[in-house]
């Protein structure tokens, strides 16, 4: 940090941030400035470091756009610094994650919660409107044949789970019928753009004082593809008043 002009002296107020299911995030201060460090999980996977560095490229490309995202400060691509993991530093986000309890303002006012949904749609529209070529992400993904690859890719993912003990198998009711329908109905026309890859309410940060999305987070599945897949996943995972969702209904069939 000192070599990159990021202050001098010890790291203070170190706190591990919760909310993610895999990667490690620490918030700390140095010389009066706050930072968030993000690295791969404690038990690194084969591609954890590559995924972290890929995220930094995406965040750097979003700088200067109107897409709400954490600001990238610095990147360390030398895993030896932390022993085994690359990492990056980003600006802290003043917001909360809706996967936990909502603040009183949001929990008590249905119009604010309604606005949260619209704000998520607005943030996603801003992401989809970014010209990925203009921001330097022309080679960030392989849009040619992207939609055609999705069904085989995810069927293969299910098959790969067979290596884990006690996995009951991929024979989910209706799986092959749905897969066949999707393959018969692949859109013939679509506009490539930045795809978050896991866009739902737990992967955004909301303002503590209103319904606005202040940052889209957890970009490890991002690529160049059809941005409408993000919209579809948002709708599938959106919880109704009774706590149900399309996604939760499917996994309980």
Predicted regions and their residues:
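ATP-binding pocket architecture of kinase catalytic cores
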Residues: 15-178, 185-194, 208
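Juxta-kinase regulatory segment immediately upstream of eukaryotic protein kinase catalytic domains
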Residues: 1-7
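Conserved N-terminal boundary motif of the eukaryotic protein kinase catalytic domain
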Residues: 9-15
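Catalytic-loop of the protein kinase fold
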Residues: 194-196, 201
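Activation of the activation-loop gatekeeper triad in protein kinase-fold domains
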Residues: 217-222
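C-lobe/activation-segment region of protein kinase-like
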Residues: 230-242
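Conserved small/polar residues in nucleotide/adenosyl-binding loops
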Residues: 251-253
């Amino acid at each position: 940090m000192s070599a990159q002009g990021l202050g001098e002296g010890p790291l203070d107020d170190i706190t591990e941030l919760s909310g993610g299911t895999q990667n490690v995030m620490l918030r700390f201060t140095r010389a009066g400035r706050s930072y968030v460090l993000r690295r791969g999980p404690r038990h690194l996977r084969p591609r954890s470091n590559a995924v972290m560095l890929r995220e930094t490229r995406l965040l750097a490309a979003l700088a200067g756009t109107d897409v709400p995202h954490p600001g990238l400060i610095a990147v360390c691509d030398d895993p030896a610094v932390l022993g085994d993991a690359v990492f990056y530093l980003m600006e802290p986000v003043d917001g909360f994650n809706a996967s936990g309890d909502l603040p009183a303002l949001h929990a008590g006012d249905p119009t604010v919660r309604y606005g949260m949904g619209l704000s998520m749609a607005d943030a996603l529209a801003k992401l989809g409107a970014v010209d990925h070529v203009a921001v330097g992400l022309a080679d960030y993904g392989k849009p040619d044949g992207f939609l055609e690859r999705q069904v085989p890719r995810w069927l293969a993912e299910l098959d790969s789970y067979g290596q884990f003990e006690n996995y009951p198998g991929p024979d989910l009711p209706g799986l092959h019928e749905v897969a066949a329908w999707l393959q018969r109905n692949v859109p013939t026309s679509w506009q490539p753009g930045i795809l978050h890859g896991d866009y739902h309410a737990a992967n955004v940060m909301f303002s503590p004082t209103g319904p606005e999305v202040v940052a889209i987070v957890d970009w490890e599945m991002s690529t160049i593809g059809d941005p409408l897949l993000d919209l579809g996943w948002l709708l599938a995972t959106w919880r109704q008043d009774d706590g149900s969702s399309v996604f939760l209904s499917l996994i309980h069939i």
